[in-house]
Structures are given as structure tokens and as C-alpha cells.
């Protein structure tokens, strides 16, 4: 199993990994543009997502962050990667790394996914 998570899915993945007994089935996780649910303006809009799980992930992970993501600063994304024991990629100015980012089929993301699957 290789997990792929975007935005709040990254937060959910960290929470799930901290509470499940099935993490050994996971080969890796590609975490893209996490949402900072502890940021006051976002926490007020999305109740019940904080606090963010702080345990290292029990499987290899790659976290991809953007310099101009409106939902998570690059510094915060890098700090989450460090907390979770994930490799961090500064993906430049790509917004929330979604369809609006103009990445199309996102060959680079597919390549990272293949690397995680092969690990």
C-alpha cells in the first residue's frame, strides 16, 4: 500500500498512522500541500482537525510543499515534514499544488509515487 494525500488528507494520514495497528502494510506516503489546521484563521473554519499528530510516521514519506500555498506556509510544511520524519521537497511557487497549479497529469508527482512504491 502506498498512500497519497493532499491538504487535509496529510493531516488525516498522520493521525491515522498514530492510531492504527495496520501501518506495517504501508510502504510509503506521498504527502502534498498539507493544510495547517492549527493556524488560527483555518482552525476557526474547520473544527475538529487540531491538534496535528506529532509522532514520526512509521513508514517512509515525502512531503511536497509550496512557497505560496494559502493554506500552509513553506516553513510550516517543512516543520511538519521534520516532525513526521518525511523527506521534504520545496516545490517552488505552485499554490496549493492542485488543478489550479497547472501541473496537468503531474509527471513529477507520479515519479515520486513510483519511488515510494519501489522502496
Where do the model's predicted regions map?
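Gly/Ala-rich beta-loop-alpha elbow adjacent to hydrolase catalytic centers
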Residues: 4-14
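Active-site nucleophile loop of the alpha/beta-hydrolase fold
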Residues: 29-39
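Short beta-strand/loop motif that positions the catalytic acidic residue
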Residues: 57, 62-65, 69
Amino acid at each position: 500500500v502506498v498512500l497519497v494525500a493532499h491538504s487535509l488528507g496529510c493531516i488525516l494520514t498522520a493521525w491515522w498512522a498514530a492510531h492504527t495497528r495496520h501501518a506495517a502494510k504501508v510502504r510509503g506516503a506521498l504527502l502534498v500541500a498539507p493544510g495547517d489546521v492549527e493556524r488560527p484563521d483555518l482552525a476557526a473554519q474547520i473544527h475538529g482537525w487540531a491538534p496535528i499528530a506529532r509522532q514520526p510516521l512509521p513508514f517512509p514519506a515525502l512531503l511536497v510543499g509550496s512557497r505560496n500555498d494559502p493554506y500552509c506556509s513553506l516553513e510550516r510544511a517543512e516543520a511538519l515534514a521534520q516532525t513526521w520524519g518525511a523527506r521534504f521537497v520545496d516545490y517552488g511557487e505552485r499554490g496549493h499544488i492542485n488543478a489550479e497549479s497547472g501541473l496537468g497529469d503531474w509527471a513529477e508527482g507520479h515519479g515520486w509515487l513510483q519511488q515510494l512504491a519501489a522502496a
